[in-house]
Amino acid sequence: MSPAMNADNPGAAATAVAAIAPALKAEILAEALPYIRKFHGKTIVVKYGGNAMTEEKLKHGFARDVILLKLVGMNPVVVHGGGPQIDEALKKVGKVGTFVQGMRVTDEETMEVVEWVLGGEVQQDIVMLINQYGGQAVGLTGKDGGLIRAKRLQMPDRENPGAFIDIGYVGDIEAINPAVVKALQDDAFIPVISPIGFSDDGQAYNINADVVAGKMAEILKAEKLVMMTNIPGVMDKKGNLLTDLSAREIEELFADGTISGGMLPKISSALDAAKSGVHSVHIIDGRIEHSLLLEILTEQAFGTMIRSH
């Protein structure tokens, strides 16, 4: 087992900090103290996806960042995606992924691929990297400790009110039992959650990772929900970054089509989390190295903040 992550483990802290560029390190150290005090003991849910999961430098940087958050007394919980990895695996079996309203259509064969890729390959890679740098990560799916109970999602057909679209084994969260996550946090572990839910009869369901992250933040009463993506944040139709969005403004962006595709479940989940009492919800650019640390430990504004009012 990896060394315990606490103040008595300076080796892990040194490993996590050493790879950060000197200028960035100085900035973080100068600004971090009030944020460390503010968020000490608080839960930070991180939706991990996009280039940050596929580019080697960003992957290693993310692992160090999560460890550093744990070392300074926060409780990071990672919920990961894996769209590109699923697409690649589907290609190998002669299938092409299709999406409806940002949700992956999931037939039986696709569900098997999703389980193997998310609950196996992707999760193990994240856990291995965190442990490699001195952290203690544990991988979970919805089956572990009854974490995520799900049922088949009823996707409303926007063109035919009252009708639904069958998108296969895509899950709608019925309940989250946070006991296993809280137990891991209490023992200084970092939970890494694959977005796969299970019904009472054992049927696996593919659940959008943004949806799982938002619901997990709500149930855990998280201080922050940070969603990492491949764009600077929410953009308007001219490509300008919208740094702050209220619930009313989000509804307008939904209505005029500015927010569409894969951003639909992301923004909906972010807004639901904010309305549920998560104090701070941010969508940030995961392509920027150490963007997670910069968002949490410095005054530097990143991405888009989602507000419930």
UniProtKB/Swiss-Prot annotation:
Any one GO molecular-function label of the UniProt entry: ATP binding
One GO term describing the cellular component: cytoplasm
Residues reported in the UniProt entry to bind substrate: G82, G83, R104, N206
Higher taxonomy: Bacteria, Pseudomonadati, Pseudomonadota, Betaproteobacteria, Burkholderiales
Entry's EC annotation: 2.7.2.8
Catalytic activity: N-acetyl-L-glutamate + ATP = N-acetyl-L-glutamyl 5-phosphate + ADP
One GO-annotated biological process of the protein: arginine biosynthetic process via ornithine
Protein name: Acetylglutamate kinase
Its biological purpose: Catalyzes the ATP-dependent phosphorylation of N-acetyl-L-glutamate.
Organism (species): Cupriavidus pinatubonensis (strain JMP 134 / LMG 1197)
Pfam families, A to Z: AA_kinase
